[in-house]
Structure formats: C-alpha cells, structure tokens
Amino acid sequence: MIRIDELLRAYRKGLFPMADPDDEKVYWCQPYKRAVVPLLSYMPSRDVARILRRGEFEVRIDSDFEGVIRGCAAPRKSDSQTWISPEIMDAYLTLNQLGVAHSVECWHHGELSGGLYGLSMGAAFFGESMFFRRSYASQVAFDHLVRRLKDRGYLLLDAQIMNPHLQKLGAVEIDHDEYMLQLDIALGKKIRFI
C-alpha cells in the first residue's frame, strides 16, 4: 500500500509512481528530462478548436474521478499493459477524496467519453494520465485543464515523460535542474484547483 504522506512528499521532490505492468510492483520515477506544458504558449489544434466551438462535450470536474482513472488504466489498442496498478488507483482515489487529485471529464449524451486526472499542489498540476472513448474527448479535457490552470495562476503543468501525443499538445522537455527550480517556485504558492 502506498502511504499518502509518502506519495505527496515524493511529488514535492520531483518523483512520481509507476507500476511494473508484469508484477504491479510500484517504482518511483524521476526522469532526467521532464515533459512540461508551457501554459502561456499553449494553443489548441484547429481540430480541437472546431470541436470546442461546436460544444460537442460537456466538461465536468471531479464528477466521476473513479471512472476516469479506470478509463486511464484500461488496456488500449496499442498496448494491453498499464502502469496504473490497483495500489496506485487506491492511492489516487484517496487523494481525490482529500481534494488533492482531480479529474477533468468530457461527457457526451450522459456518457463519460474521455478525460484526464492529476494532482494539484501549490501552483503545480501533475498530469497523470488521459483516455478517450470518443475522438477528441481527452484533448478537449486537456484544453479545459490548461485554461483552468491559466485562469487560476498556476505556474507548472508537469506532463512527466514525453511521448508523441504530449508533444502534439505542446509539451516540451526540460532538464532535471530546471524542472526542480520550476517545481520549487510553484510549490511555494497557494492556489486551489476548485
């Protein structure tokens, strides 16, 4: 079982948990290069902007956190394994109940169509995972997250490990020292996600 105090302390030190898909053992990760999304320069893609204009999704916050984390943990077409073990899931469900972990959800005709979840600490948001069941749902949730973080004065959106999808969303890589500097500044501020 992951202790909540240890989990929060790890995030403050630049670490985050991932479970081995084969044995579900939890490891602490601290990549040398960190993916972050520069909040001020973020722009949605044309396709996402079009979807936003059409209002295809209802965006909600924390109305089905468990549904989002389960959606993120479900096997994907490209990969049948997940780093979100039951132990990690339980820890984040507790963090949601404590008001630290949050979900941004896209709903279409009453169905959860996609979303993301992460942790809010100070002026930092640690994005953990996203999923979609309907095209563009996770990207609309991401756009809503970025706008919310900008509006509230957040300084850091940590995307953890770069991948092609994050790169399309505007993430860039920074080295560990720069990340820790940004993290320290962001943790020094008090901002509420909700």
Curated annotation (Swiss-Prot):
This is Leucyl/phenylalanyl-tRNA--protein transferase. InterPro entries: Acyl_CoA_acyltransferase, Leu/Phe-tRNA_Trfase, Leu/Phe-tRNA_Trfase_C, Leu/Phe-tRNA_Trfase_N. It is an enzyme of class 2 (transferase). The keyword GTP-binding does not apply. One of its GO terms (cellular component) is cytoplasm. It catalyses: N-terminal L-lysyl-[protein] + L-leucyl-tRNA(Leu) = N-terminal L-leucyl-L-lysyl-[protein] + tRNA(Leu) + H(+); N-terminal L-arginyl-[protein] + L-leucyl-tRNA(Leu) = N-terminal L-leucyl-L-arginyl-[protein] + tRNA(Leu) + H(+); L-phenylalanyl-tRNA(Phe) + an N-terminal L-alpha-aminoacyl-[protein] = an N-terminal L-phenylalanyl-L-alpha-aminoacyl-[protein] + tRNA(Phe). Functions in the N-end rule pathway of protein degradation where it conjugates Leu, Phe and, less efficiently, Met from aminoacyl-tRNAs to the N-termini of proteins containing an N-terminal arginine or lysine.
